């Protein structure tokens, strides 16, 4: 709610780690609020440790819900599918691939996978499709039609599965991702 009061543009939304928190995709508390804004701005000096504003062009603002937050009114927050897309686009703003995979696992029954695939197409970034497809395979989320659609984004380029981690000497997989986080590491974090 505080974010709504300090942004200077109407096309803002709660995003990344904060949206994951809103949708119950985290297992730990969050101290900072991540807000996408269409006008470059900084949080007030006294709130810089509590807020992070991420600039995005207005045409990229979609997949947003207005959600009632107690008696304080409504806030704009990424829907669960847009939350996943944003997270896979910039894992650094969501704690990395293991946090994202854990969040997908926690909410796997509430996710609209058709909508998620449509959002992948709308973003048109192959790395998002590759990360999502690989995570779905690791977690055994059996949506064959969606996974096959995501495989259509695989080209010759290799990307890092998790850009936050070490960038050398790792195996490559069929999704053309460099495995700097292994499937076993993800499974151990989720199922431990």
Functional labels for PLM-detected ranges:
Residues 66-192:
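Hydrophobic alpha-helical interaction segments
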Residues 49-77:
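Glycine- and acidic-residue-rich phosphate-binding/metal-coordinating active-site segment common to enzymes
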Residues 1-60:
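Short gly/ser-rich loop at a beta-strand->alpha-helix junction or flexible surface loop bordering the NTP-binding
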């Amino acid at each position: 709610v505080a974010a709504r009061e300090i942004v200077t543009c109407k096309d803002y939304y709660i995003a990344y780690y904060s949206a994951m928190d809103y949708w119950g995709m985290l297992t730990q508390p969050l101290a900072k609020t991540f807000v996408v804004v269409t006008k470059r701005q900084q949080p007030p000096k006294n709130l810089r440790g509590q807020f992070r504003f991420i600039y995005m062009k207005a045409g990229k603002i979609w997949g947003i819900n207005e959600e009632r937050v107690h008696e304080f009114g409504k806030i704009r927050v990424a829907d669960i599918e847009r939350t996943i897309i944003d997270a896979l686009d910039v894992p650094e703003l969501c704690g990395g691939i293991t946090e994202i995979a854990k969040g997908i696992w926690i909410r796997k029954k509430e996710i609209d996978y058709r909508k998620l695939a449509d959002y992948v197409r709308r973003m048109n970034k192959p790395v998002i499709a590759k990360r999502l497809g690989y995570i779905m395979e690791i977690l055994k989320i059996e949506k064959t039609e969606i996974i096959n659609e995501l495989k259509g984004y695989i080209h010759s380029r290799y990307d890092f599965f998790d850009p936050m981690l070490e960038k050398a000497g790792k195996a490559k997989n069929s999704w053309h991702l460099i495995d700097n986080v292994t499937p076993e590491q993800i499974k151990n974090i989720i199922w431990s």
